[in-house]
Every structure is written in C-alpha cells, then in structure tokens.
C-alpha cells in the first residue's frame, strides 16, 4: 500500500491549518491540559517544606499515584510511539521485548521494593545514591555520590534535551510552530509545575498521564482491529502481504541468532533496575500495603498498554502496509481511523505524553545535583529554594542544548537507559540481596558498568567494516549482533561479579531478612 501522509505534511498539513475544527480542539485540549498541570503544581507547592518533600513527596505516595506514575515514568510516549513502531517493523518476534520489560516491573516492585522502601525511609535517604553508598566509608561514600550524581546529571540533561526536541518536532508538525517556540512552550509548562510542586506535582501529573495513555491504548488498537476486519482477517492479510518471517515468533532466525536477538531485546528490562527516577517511586511509597497494591496497578497498566500497542502495530501493518516513519504509526492510525475532532484529542494527548516524560527526569537530575553533589550544603535551611534553582538551571541548559546541538547527538545518548542501568543496577541488586560491597568495589562497578555500555554502543555505531580486524573488529562484530545483547547484558554481569566478589561483613544490627 502507498504511504499515507501524516498531519503536518502534504494534504495532512492543510487539514490542520488555522480554522480547521480539529486544530481548535487540539489547541483547546492542550491549553486545558497544561492549565491542569499548572494547577496541580500550585496545589502541591504547599506540601514542600524540606528536601525530602521536594524530591520524594514526603514519602507519602498512595498506591494509585505510585503505580500509575511509575508506569508513566517508565514508558510514557516511548511505548506508544517507539514500541509500536518496533513491532510494526519486526513483527511478532519483536514481542520478545515484552517479557523483559514486564520482568523489570516485577523485579523493581517485588524484589527491590521492600528493602529499598524500608531502609531508605528508616535512614532518611533522599536519593538512590545514598542507598548504594551505604556500605562505604565516609570518604569513599562522598566519591560515590559525586560519581553517581555526575553520571545522572550528564545523561539526564542530554535525555531531557532529546525529549524537548521530540516535543518540538511534534508541535512543528501539528501546528507549524517555529522550532524555538515549540521547544520553549513545552519547557516552560513543565518547569512551572515542577518548580512549584516538586515530586508531588510530577507524580500526580504522571498519574494523569498514565491513565490517559491506558485509555488511548484501549480505544485506538480496538478501532484498528475492527478496521482490519477482526483478528482472523488481520492475520490473513499479514500472511498474504508480509514475508513469513514477520509472523514467526523467531523471525525465522537460526537458533543461535534467535537466542541472541530474544535475549538482547528482553534485556532492555535490565535497565529498569538502575533508573533513579523509578527507584524514587519505591522510596516514596507510604507503606507496604500501598507498595503491593501499587505493583498490581502498575503491572496491570503494563499488560494493557503493551498488549494494546502490539495489536495497534500489527493492525496498522495490515491496514497501511509500508510507511515512511514507523514511529509515526500512532499518528497515522489516529488520522485514518478517528473523526478529525477525536483524532485531534488523541494527538494532543500524545504531545502531552512526549513532554511529560521530562518531569521525572528533571526531578532526578535536580536531586543528583542538589543532594548528591551537595549543592544544598552551601545554603543551609534553603533546601527547597536551592532545589528549585538547580531544576531551573538544568531545564535552561537542556533547552539550550535542544536549540543548538545537532539532533543526531541526542540519538547517540539515548542509550542512557542501558548505561545507567548497568552502572547502578548491579550495586542496588547487591545491596537488596543483603551484600555490603566495599566502597572501592561500588566505585569500580559504577565505572565498569557505564564504560562497558559505552564501549559496545560505540563499536555498534562504528560497524565491523570500519573497525577493521583484531580486537576492534571482534568488538564491533559482537556489538552488531541483532538485539544488542552485548550492550545490554555484559555491562551488567561484570559489575555484578565485582560487587559480590569484594564484600565486607555487615554488622548484626544492620542485617535484614
């Protein structure tokens, strides 16, 4: 089938010009949504009295807020746009990613959750770095905080900038807004409610976003399935129009290539265990009952949304055939299947989801700078004010990067999910499993996990031919294996071996079951 233009190009752009009813609905929906976000920020501002309130919501998150805000922070627009596009391209074999992602939910909430919540509350830890460095001596603990805070700040500033860029592209394509205005519009609204309300505002707005995403993940895939003629007809269409590998669970790969691909895409879930903004949700949940209920809510959301997006991808392939940009599938299907006004509402929700990805990252990056790098110690009893100044500074810097640095640079740093996961995840896992790694081992594990991810990512970008022979050629060939198992798994294994090999006895009173 031929390519169907999206709104913002060709005839689609004409539909969204000023005066078109859908355009008015999109703008009205966005304005209303942003006003709600700002109102939440104003309301939540009265809850911020100290550093713990601003970065952890006073450790008072209930089950629904914790569960839905975690889910939205984990996936946000990525699952609607990126995951659906991935399944659209690779077919049924792409679904091997899903068990790994779901396993990440289970591991964080049921394995990490009990100890992480209890110990961080008891000892008043503000960031996950405090938890990682607990077994180190004072001087080494300070080095761990500086290293971890610096890595979070570096990767998240670039990731935030990438999200601002993605939001800008969406605004440009939908409303023909200039690039600078598009970036500033998203940044200003996020900064306002984040500055006012801190973690509470971010969690509440992410809860709203998570609920909206779940609703969309039901409505649009259902419309797609009906338009494709139902599940039987959809499968028959794909069988006739696509290569047989598209509907094969292995992608018709050989046994070893299939294992590498499935293992690699499933290992995306490993990155979950080292994300500071996700660990913060577990640290902030108010009690064990809320944690258990929050897991049920988050897991139900994940099953619903990932199933819906997989269905959307397959029905979209049956309906549309080949399209220019797979990550535009969601927009394509909304424009094709829904009335103009309703499609406008859906697109407005996606634009909001793209921008709302940033808020949790901003809080985590601000915590890294203000708490881990000890900036708040320069101004005693001004913790909230300093945290807000840091957040504003990070946002301004990210906006400047968005406007001045080539977008391809942003693409190269989107590996931060795997890099931070490999840097922090093994150390957190060791602490959760009652190990007390020596301080220097924690430092070395963080460096090793991050550096190994960078190594394989870099060689994957270079390619085997450009790398030549010898060790470089071998690393490039390993990095080029479909599914990227060496980029996602090896950087986890090496630090894990390190922290378990160099442990110190824990005092009896510090041991937990």
Task: Specify the residue positions occupied by each region the protein language model found.
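Membrane-embedded helix-loop-helix hairpins and adjacent transmembrane boundary segments
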Residues: 12-513
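Short, Lys/Arg-enriched N-terminal segments with co-localized hydrophobic residues
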Residues: 3-15
